[in-house]
């Protein structure tokens, strides 16, 4: 998504799938990807509305909207107004940005991750458990409170291949294949906190995340530890 803060937008129905899923010519719904859940929301058309329970990726970059029921759907060619569940989306944005900071606080290879509207977690290639949990939590919240800008830029697939150090995740491939890759930068050129490829949604400043606390640190196999973080409020 070019603008994570876009809450509503019009679009035209280009396809209704056999499973009654809906594809629009342009969509503000984020599909399940990279550990981030797909958006919920609704489509307004005519005198009715269609609830969307999740969003997923289809072939060739299609964004597939999954309706709650099949009784009242738009038709191909209809113009609809899209409304995402902004409260949930914004929490996903805050958690996703917090996880990028967590990968700075714990500078180890990431083997997995997950985002919800109340917490997030990263799995690290970490044979030994953390001994300084409180110190790391304090460091995370210092970065959040720093109010660092979060911005996007683009490089080509070839440029990313030439800079493998940008990729922190071992289990999830960066969003390549379209010819260009989005980089998410935290901080500025002269005070860069983090830079990594990511197709997800993020807040515009770390200060929007809010205070986080460390939750359970779980052992997941010989080499892996799962670190959970939660909103304080």
Spans of model-derived segments:
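Active-/binding-site microenvironments in catalytic and ligand-binding cores
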Residues: 1-233
């Amino acid at each position: 998504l070019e603008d994570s803060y876009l809450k509503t937008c019009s679009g035209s129905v280009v396809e209704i799938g056999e499973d009654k899923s809906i594809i629009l010519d342009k969509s503000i719904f984020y599909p399940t990807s990279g550990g981030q859940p797909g958006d919920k929301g609704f489509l307004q058309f005519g005198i009715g509305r269609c609830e969307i329970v999740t969003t997923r990726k289809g072939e060739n970059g299609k964004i597939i909207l999954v309706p709650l029921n099949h009784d009242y759907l738009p038709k191909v060619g209809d113009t609809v107004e899209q409304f995402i569940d902004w409260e949930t989306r914004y929490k996903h944005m805050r958690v996703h940005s917090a996880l990028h900071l967590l990968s700075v606080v714990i500078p180890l290879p990431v083997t997995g991750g997950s985002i919800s509207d109340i917490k997030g977690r990263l799995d690290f290639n970490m044979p030994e458990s953390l001994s300084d949990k409180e110190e790391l939590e304090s460091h995370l919240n210092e970065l959040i409170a720093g109010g660092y800008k979060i911005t996007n830029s683009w490089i080509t697939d070839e440029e990313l291949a030439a800079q493998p150090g940008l990729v922190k995740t071992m289990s999830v491939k960066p969003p390549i294949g379209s010819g260009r890759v989005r980089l998410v930068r935290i901080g500025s050129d002269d005070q860069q906190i983090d830079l990594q490829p990511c197709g997800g949604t993020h807040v515009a400043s770390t200060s929007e995340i809010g205070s986080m606390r460390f939750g359970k640190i779980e052992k997941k196999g010989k080499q892996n530890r799962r670190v959970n973080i939660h909103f304080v409020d």
